[in-house]
């Protein structure tokens, strides 16, 4: 950067390709100085020796741990030290056609019961309208992320506090059964992924969608590459934004409201240019921070919430940022302060599998091998019952666990 005098080469990598690339680079001794990555991989990489924990922890100390989201630091902690530096995050959302829900007298879809009731009531495949659209692609992390929110909502956990895999628990079987029934009965046919689910909702062909908040600027007609195409959108491009409700957290019959959260961090590769990496990250999270959040405020909530002098400075600045690509607007002016406040409050209560039980390395493994999306697809294809899929998911997770522990 100009400010630090450090020359930076930016290499863009797809999220699904990260695990393999880090392994290849580790083998060839070419780990990146700084790797921007989702928390799914942080603890696993640290325990594999791919991240310089001491270097990252020093950055957090230099910037003051109290200025970061405590939850984000907890997710990235290994043996009492922060393994990578939290940058930003987002919480997954269930969006729904509030106009159609209101007209049908349906409750907001914040529980399994309300979600299924609405999907059944509004599903009309003969007119190309579906109760819900959500990911079912066996090869996509997006399916893991989507299902995990439903699992967490029903208190279906990856492991118990003792580290025993619990994917075959009654709660997990129930979550698998609910999710697959929802998609089998009330969703479009075929493989659904991050692109097709958005396209279906934007075409006005679905009552509900599960997606990240990156959809918010697109739904507000701010990005030409992903424009709403519903019939009403021709005359009113912001029709969907005006008529969609937003649910951050959902609850199943055996759980309490939960929201899947994704935190992005900056890790420092082992045996790399550590001092330059530390200087770059400290600049990124101070003088360069708001410029970074401006890239996509709808999906980049600040995990460094402020400074020692003003603990909420970055949150306050974030609320004023304009989102969009081809057009720009402040999200609060489109969706209202209540929605924005919900996004802010949710950022401190994100839920995830495994991390609080010290299973970050196992999380990294299953996000790489994807036994859960594969199991979901097996049920949808008729190749397994929810009970069989849960047992297979658990068995594959246990195999990963045994490999990691040398058992």
Spans of model-derived segments:
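Extracytoplasmic/periplasmic solute-binding protein
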Residues: 81-87, 116-164, 194, 198-199, ...
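Glycine-centered hinge/linker elements that transmit conformational signals in sensory
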Residues: 119-121, 162-191, 235-249
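A ligand-binding cleft/hinge motif common to bilobed small-molecule-binding domains
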Residues: 42-46, 213-238
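Extracytoplasmic "Venus flytrap"/periplasmic binding protein-like
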Residues: 3-68, 99-110, 200, 207-208, ...
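Short amphipathic alpha-helical coupling segments at ligand-binding clamshell hinges
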Residues: 6, 174-178, 272-284, 389
